[in-house]
Curated annotation (Swiss-Prot):
It comes from Sphingobium chlorophenolicum. Dechlorination of pentachlorophenol to tetrachlorobenzoquinone. Also removes hydrogen and nitro, amino, and cyano groups from benzene ring at the para position in relation to the hydroxyl of phenol. This is Pentachlorophenol 4-monooxygenase. Induction: By polychlorinated phenols. Its cofactor is FAD. Pfam families: FAD_binding_3 (PF01494). Its EC number is 1.14.13.50. SUPFAM superfamilies: FAD/NAD(P)-binding domain. The lineage of its organism: Bacteria, Pseudomonadati, Pseudomonadota, Alphaproteobacteria, Sphingomonadales. InterPro entries: FAD-bd, FAD/NAD-bd_sf, RIFMO-like. It is an enzyme of class 1 (oxidoreductase).
Length: 538
């Protein structure tokens, strides 16, 4: 995996980028900047990192991101693998599943991993690779920007004040974002007034539903969520309608036991490790960018926890933004590229809010009866649509990149997720695009088109040497010893990318999306797409 040299300590006072917030969104942003040689500094007002967390699901699209970064195996080795969700409605056999085995790729499941542990893995990777650490107990007091740049006033852990002038700021500081407040950006939406969620990590004896699925137990006026966590504990969440609103842990355990027993009269809760409660919001920032300051994660959007997508979408915000800031900062990409962060990610957040609200109404539509909620889970197409949305695999940027798509081609379009394909033993497409820079994938359909494919590859390599070329010859071709030439040995590239009679090429982004795709006879479309993104070689 190619990386740039690091020219400055990650947390130097004169770092190019200030990241406010030390959670998963901020940590992914730091990774994307540092691996491209852009210095950054991360601050968080908390005195230490979180030791507990509410989020515990890493979905398929995020696992592909973790693979791209190089740390997916750590989550697989120590996480709990869940097949998906069960919806168990009270007093009926009309139950439903969201079975994640239908998903494409290497991660057709949910990885259960506490957010605080997810953060720990990311922090350790940043420290080991870049000697980078968040600055805990450091608070953003004020943030201003004008024609002279950005001014950020900080209070350090020892109480002293410091003023810095980063060129960029990423606000990943949660639902009560100080960055968003300083920018004067509205956070519009509503609260789910009827829903206070209460959560507990606790051992369970004789839990009959099993550990291979995440379980929703749904009654007309209540619900219980249960999933196995790494180690011996389970995560249990209930809707709080007053009965579980207790002040001490033992009373809380008794209330949880009562809720769980109404669905499973054999399961018994042990002494809880910890418990918490929170109110559910549905809100979204009216803008993700103001000048050189950006919002990401919960600072930009929050929603019902139904489906467990929140942490995942926040990390994907950072994965979309980090490489763009880095390439603009380095003079490799045009500044207009940064406008695409808002235009690409706000529709995703809107879909997220709508999708989580729909699932929220099934799980926590208290007082609305079960019949309509059950019918929603039986509707044609509901299973696959919900599974792809919750996993993050359905989100795309087709509308934003439609002008860079050749609609004659079968298979994925510009704006879609990059489909993986095994090209040869121990060589997968994902291995070839694990770069800090864009990749040009050129795929002639026949040996007769190889010369034309090489001509397009060489043209783009000459004008944009930053782009990594990968040429994949059709199945049956002789193996090549060239480093950037491969063979579709098993025909998987053809199956995953469409059975096209003519060859094609695609510009693949560092965040695992297709930026442009066109037939070999439309090389001008590829040139136009690259020219819109990158600075030409002088």
């Amino acid at each position: 995996m190619s990386t740039y040299p690091i020219n400055a300590p990650g947390q130097s006072a004169d770092a190019a980028v200030l990241i406010v917030g030390g959670g998963p969104t901020g940590l992914i942003a730091a990774n994307e900047l540092l691996r491209r040689g852009v210095s950054c500094r991360m601050i968080d007002r908390l005195p230490v990192a979180h030791q507990t967390s509410k989020s515990c699901t890493i979905h398929a699209r995020s696992m592909e991101m973790m693979e791209h970064i190089g740390i997916a195996a750590r989550y697989i080795e120590t996480g709990v693998r869940s097949n998906g969700f069960t919806f168990n409605f009270e007093n009926t056999d009309a139950n439903a599943l969201l079975d994640f085995s239908v998903l494409p790729g290497r991660y057709p499941f949910i990885t259960i991993y506490n957010q605080n542990e997810t953060e720990r893995v990311l922090r350790h990777d940043l420290e080991a690779t870049y000697s980078f650490q968040p600055e805990w107990g450091t608070q953003l007091l004020a943030l201003n920007q004008d024609e002279n740049g950005i001014r950020a006033d900080l209070r350090l852990k020892d109480g002293t004040k410091q003023t810095i002038s980063p060129r960029w700021v990423i606000g990943a500081d949660g639902v009560r974002s100080r960055v968003r407040e300083c920018l004067g950006i509205a956070y519009e939406g509503e609260d789910y007034e009827e829903n206070v969620l209460q959560m507990m990590d606790v051992g369970i004896q004789d839990f009959e539903a099993g550990d291979d699925w995440i379980h929703y137990f749904i009654g007309q006026d209540k619900f219980v969520f249960v999933t196995k966590l790494p180690g011996s504990n389970y995560r249990v969440i209930i809707s709080d309608l007053g009965g579980a609103n207790k002040s001490n842990l033992e009373e809380t355990r008794e209330a949880f036991q009562g809720y769980l027993s109404s669905f499973d009269d054999h399961a018994t809760l042990d002494e809880p490790r910890w418990a918490t409660k929170w109110r559910v919001w549905k809100r979204m920032a009216t803008a993700y960018r103001k000048g050189n300051v950006f919002l990401a994660g919960d600072a930009a959007h929050c929603h019902s926890p139904s489906g467990g997508s929140g942490m995942n979408v926040g990390m994907q915000d950072a994965f979309n933004l980090g490489w763009k800031i880095a390439m603009v900062e380095r003079g490799e990409a045009k500044p207009d590229l940064l406008d695409t962060y808002h235009t690409e990610r706000t529709p995703v957040a809107q879909q997220l809010l709508e999708g989580t609200h729909a699932m929220h109404e099934i799980i926590m539509g208290h007082g609305k009866g079960l019949t309509d909620r059950i019918e929603l889970t039986q509707a044609p197409g509901w299973h696959d649509a919900a599974t792809y949305r919750v996993s993050g695999m359905s989100y795309n940027y087709r509308d934003q990149l439609v002008s860079f798509n050749d609609d004659r081609l079968a298979g994925p379009s510009a704006g879609d997720r990059i489909p993986d394909a095994e090209l040869a033993p121990r060589i997968r497409l994902f291995d070839l695009v694990r770069n800090t820079r864009p990749t040009l994938l050129v795929a002639p359909a026949t040996e007769a088109e190889v010369a034309e494919a090489e001509k397009l590859r060489d043209l783009i390599r000459e004008q944009w040497p930053l782009v990594k070329p990968v040429l994949v010859r059709p199945q049956g071709s002789e193996e090549s010893i060239e480093g950037d030439v491969h063979v579709d040995s098993y025909g998987q590239l053809k199956r995953e990318w469409g059975d096209n009679a003519k060859g094609w090429a695609a510009l693949l982004r560092p965040d695992n999306y297709i930026h442009a795709r066109a037939g070999l006879d439309r090389g001008d479309l590829l040139v136009q797409a690259i020219d819109a993104m990158l600075v030409r070689c002088a």
